UniProtKB/Swiss-Prot annotation:
Top EC class of this enzyme: hydrolase
Organism listed in the record: Coccidioides immitis (strain RS)
Membrane topology label: Single-pass membrane protein
Span of domain PNPLA: 281-472
Family (UniProt): Belongs to the PLPL family.
Annotated region (Disordered), positions in chain: 1-26, 667-730
An annotated GO BP: triglyceride metabolic process
Compositional bias ranges of the Basic residues kind: 1-11
Active-site feature positions: 314, 459
Pfam families, alphabetized: DUF3336, Patatin
Alphabetized CDD domains for the sequence: Pat_PLPL
Subcellular location, principal: membrane
Protein's recorded name: Patatin-like phospholipase domain-containing protein CIMG_04897
Annotated GO CC locations: membrane
Amino acid sequence: MTANSSRRRLQMKSPRTDGDEKEEDYGLPDFHTRFINDEDLEEFEKALNAPQALSLIAINDWRPIHRRVRKPGKLPKVPQRTKDETREGVVYTLLKWPFLLFVLSWIVFLGALYILTRLYISLYEHFFAWTGQRQRLRRALHSTVDYQHWKNAAKELDEYLGNDAWKERPQYAYYDNTTVMTVVSQLRQLRAQTEAGGINGKAAAEELCTLLEGCIKTNFAGIENPRLYSETYYGTKDLVQEFIEEAHTSLRLVLTSQQLSDERKQGLFRHLDTNFGRTVLCLSGGATLAYYHFGVIKALLDNDVLPDIISGTSGGALVAALVATRTDEELKKLLVPELAHKIKACQDGITTWAVRCWRTGARFDVMQWAEQCSWFCRGSTTFREAYERTGRVLNVSCVPSDPHSPTILANYLTSPNCVIWSAVLASAAVPGILNPVVLMMKKPDGTLAPYSFGHKWKDGSLRTDIPLKALDVHFNASFSIVSQVNPHISLFFFSSRGSVGRPVTHRKGRGWRGGFLGSALEQYIKLDLNKWLKVMRHLELLPRPLGQDWSEIWLQRFSGTVTIWPKSVLSDLYYILSDPSVQRLARMLHEGQQCTFPKIKFISNRMKIERVIAEGLMKDPEWAGSGRWNNVPFRSRTDQTLPLEENAQQRSASMLADTMSHLRDTGHFREAPTSHPTGSPVRPTSGRRNSLMEEIRRQSAVFFDDTDDTMPSDDEKFPYQGQSSGTKIG
């Protein structure tokens, strides 16, 4: 396809009149706006058709190397394992294929057995757990259309099941209730003294800051353990909620107090930002199942708990791009079923895409997708421009077509001038569905040019569907919300002891879903499947269809601190590569909201503290900017230039001694060796300063969150490796 043919194709569109636009915009803002221009598409097409870097054709003038010439119209050869990657040996050669056949057969058998096990568990719960009044209350819960009605129904179900008594009892094995109770009491006392004012009020304000530095951190004393939100449909322990409210009130008091200097406040909130971290929303891939993310976004937005840092991969990247380039007011108008009228990426008939697949090796045309995608990204908007417009940080995971090069997480820090729609296309370029594409960058004059020497990129889900490690490196993301819709992963999601907002109902929450035997069999089969997938990968048994190691789509981490699993139906698999109708998108929006409602209380408790810290940072002249954040809002992630004052260390030591003495008296504390000699200054370690009450955190660290059993991939271990292949834009 040439540039001229592309221009003719784009100009064939019939123009609309103003009257037509008013009648057919379906209430969507910018419905008829074409944000991208033909020149940008032409530059993209030139970059796609540009020849790759030529290989060596002569050793010297007298020794030419004759290269094979590919005939026109012939598909490029799919890359295979090179000689360096192929194992040698007689036994390996003889046993590789028989062993691979045995392993694949065993995996198929285990998969069938797993489906039967899940069916048994569903029947067990249907006949033994959800009966009578429980079932009626559960149906009422699932039929709600907004969060307020859902919350009322959840409270009614909790009351019927007797979960309110669990909330009132502070003791629980998964957090340190004694430490939390002591800190709440001290916060309340110091806050009252600070509000009273006077000489004692100023000293109390300093002590309050010291205590806040010690307790405002990620998962302090285990209060962010998901288990604390998995025993009820709504809410958590009353003591935990009391801590959240008291910490929020105390931070507000410090923020507005006249008894503290501006320098003291600035140092405090920088410290808290480093210790507490940021919340990030990750949207997985999943083809057209990614439209369930719209419902997740709508639920978070309507309840004002949508994080500013958003990551998307494959189909999730398209949703994330829409969110990151629109304001809250625009999003509320766009997240409606009528948005389906704007989703036309899969409208070609079978005769069209079948011929294209035969000619190009991919079902969809890159240029058509570029035009469709540009509306969701507001034309050739770059990552930096999107950040400056909305204050949201967009991250898109892309994988190089070379199987051994590192992945990139494109955002306004690593690739500020990269055009968003090109990154979204690259993240969605599944082999056989869409050919690898070239990323584009915007030059100072506004024109586009190839990014990273014209290297081509493909679907990020193949290796880093949920790039949590990279997000932590760049943005100090210590709390993750993952919306997971991949069909090959959703099938195997099962929480035998309940999840956030979805407790086990029988035996007062202390039982197992499907009984102990059902849960044990489910867990055993799942772990055995994971084991054999790793065996195939490490023994290099799998071939590479379409030049891709497909074992990575199973052997990644797909969950976060809070994982949202929208409930799909079998028809979704049939329409997995089809545009949604208004009715289907309405159902997806509803299901996305329904599965998000149980998680909102957990998320809102986290965001309540995080936003007060952000407000405190905005009062810092070095951080405040024109938007919600400064152009460098994450500076404290690596800031090591803020030493603690000597008197603050002395106050910290005195207060820490008092707290430790109280815990020793109650028998809830054991001495542990300190990592710093007495009198040595406290300095940041690896970009994070030790808190003033590190001992309390260390003692409470025995209560760990539930972790994912799946081993992270190599890309998760090393998410960002300096972009040695020219992946940064100057």
